[in-house]
Amino acid sequence: MEKIIKNGKLVTDSEIFDADILIRDEKIVAVGKEFNESNAEIIDASGKLVLPGGVDAHVHLDLPMPGTVSSDDHYTGTKAAAFGGTTTVIDFANHDLPSLIDSFNVWQEKALPNVAIDYGIHQNFTRFNENTLKE
């Protein structure tokens, strides 16, 4: 199924211009005018700005803390982000296990089935040793 966002003002990092957006299989495939509308769902963006999705490069989702866990889990936090126009988050993952890679994999297995938007992970080095150096 195709969608066309029509009549909006597209905002980029350098300009604002009139254009339509053609979406196929949930991906933007073209920006321009005069797309074939015969089989497309039309979204009228007249009088509206059309912006790219935001990226939040530092979030804490389902993060254990002494005696509690952060308020949003991976689903509620990414769903709330989407409602605010954020389409990608980079989540903090604890380095709780002896291996950085194991900590990363455990966090990813916990998160990925539950996220509602694009998702990445960053970690800190809470300890540095020979194993960490090898990884």
Please name every model-derived segment.
Residues M1-I4, K9-P52:
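Histidine-rich, glycine-flanked metal-binding segment
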Residues V11, F17, G67, D96-L97, ...:
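Short strand->helix junction
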